[in-house]
Amino acid sequence: MVEQIMIQGTASDAGKSVIVAGLCRLFKNKGKRVVPFKSQNMSLNSFITATGDEMGRAQVFQAEAAGVFPDVRMNPVLLKPTNDRQSQVIFMGAILDNMDAVSYHDFKQTLIPKIQAVYQSLADENDIIVLEGAGSPAEINLNDRDIVNMGMAKMVDAPVVLVADIDKGGVFASIYGTIMLLKEEERARLKGVIINKFRGDVALLQPGIEMIEELTNVPVIGVIPYANLQLEEEDSVSLSGKNYVLDSSALLDIAIICLPRISNFTDFHILEIQPDISVRYIRNLADFGNPDLVIIPGSKNTLEDMAFLEQSGLKKAIQNYAENAGKVIGICGGYQMLGKRMLDPNQVESEKVEIAGLGLLDTETIFLDQKRTTQITGVTFSSEPVEGYEIHMGQTKRGENTQPFCKIKAVNGNQETHEDGAISANKNIIGTYIHGIFDNDIFLGNLFNELLTQKNKSIYPHEIIKLKEHKETEYDKLAALLEANIQMDQLEKIMKGEKICVSTQKPAIKE
């Protein structure tokens, strides 16, 4: 019979996703068949599986930690906000519809038996499932139809551990408030608490731990120190912690336009971990500066984000930068914005039906009802092998003054040839639909060398950090961190359904 544990949090960005990933790697290293599971994820960071299914990147990250291929069953429901009131609802990798919050709140009850069936199929194939909740289980206005926190735990009779972020302050209030807002039967399901992102001497924390255990009768089974691990951040809340300041000592200054509806910002994690590279996120004109490369990322609402560039003055700044031989790369929605205009006659993305683009590429995009979701492999115009994935509802047509960026050779593992993207005549403007393009180390190394040559500097002096190898190292560090700072004997008892009691044992931080 499968063992299971559910990690819930006192709030978004408490560290649920990372702890789930760490536990997946920890159990994998013990020889267990383990998979992650999150019934419903709301995110604009998504991934395309080998079968062409769309799922949240957090569960991809966790699957990698577990040593298994991403499987859409690990995240059956994905909500991708299109605006402040509506989301695209994706079930088992395919679009169902666009819904507002009220409509979805009513609709999601119909998904319960399907979610249960999906979960059971994973349970039949594995030794352990590590579940993740969303936000907080104490969203009392939504709990009557919850399918992702205590509602999910009840569906599969999973014990729950609550994670609280001490780094933001107010950790004991957040623990106590969350537990007190739970129903009695939900509190009975809560078996332990983990305090996350702790800095300092744990002895100073001990009186608070003892008091919160006495108040709640729930044991604190771990205190995780703040660790500067280089892991992907999937939650949009983490964008607030991104760098916005130039590191003047770096060899290259890469500026990413932080669009209001930015999607797949995980594309840029690989840039952030390279030595001597400054990556900063630009929200306004004052921060533009004089970068060596400007990247326009993907967007869930490309027309509205194009309007943002116009209103903020960034459109003109990017155009002036390009006219002065600046290098600009657009990914997915960013590629569409580089063109002359975008058409949305069926209002697939927004209420706008047409908007002018940046005019830096001789291209035009029309939005269609059908979404393209594929994994691809191909070769760039410079003969660099690349792989990645596409997620878009736009179809872009190139004009005479551009050439393709890439020749696609395989789609979802099947041989298929077509052209992707566009490059300007002077080669300074590049647009592509390929997410994960910078994860290709040959392409990235050549890009760095090109940018340094333009500055009359020698080639990039460091070996490009390869993402897959880097991730494996970080997953092992994360697993070791959790094993050293969680009472694993207590956690394993919880997973086996055994009762544990509040302990007087003092936790000791181990870096």
UniProtKB/Swiss-Prot annotation:
The species this protein was found in: Listeria innocua serovar 6a (strain ATCC BAA-680 / CLIP 11262)
Q: Where is the active site?
A: 332 (nucleophile), 435
Cite the GATase cobBQ-type domain residue spans from the record. 251-443
Biological process according to GO:
cobalamin biosynthetic process
Which InterPro entries does the record match to this protein? Class_I_gatase-like (IPR029062), CobQ/CobB/MinD/ParA_Nub-bd_dom (IPR002586), CobQ_GATase1 (IPR033949), CobQ_N (IPR047045), CobQ_synth (IPR004459), GATase_3 (IPR011698), P-loop_NTPase (IPR027417)
The leader peptide range reads none
Q: Which CDD domains match?
A: CobQ_N, GATase1_CobQ
Q: What is this protein called?
A: Cobyric acid synthase
Family membership, please give it: Belongs to the CobB/CobQ family. CobQ subfamily.
What gene codes for this chain? Answer: cobQ
- Name the UniProt key words of this record, in alphabetical order: Cobalamin biosynthesis, Glutamine amidotransferase
Q: Which PANTHER family match?
A: COBYRIC ACID SYNTHASE, DETHIOBIOTIN SYNTHETASE
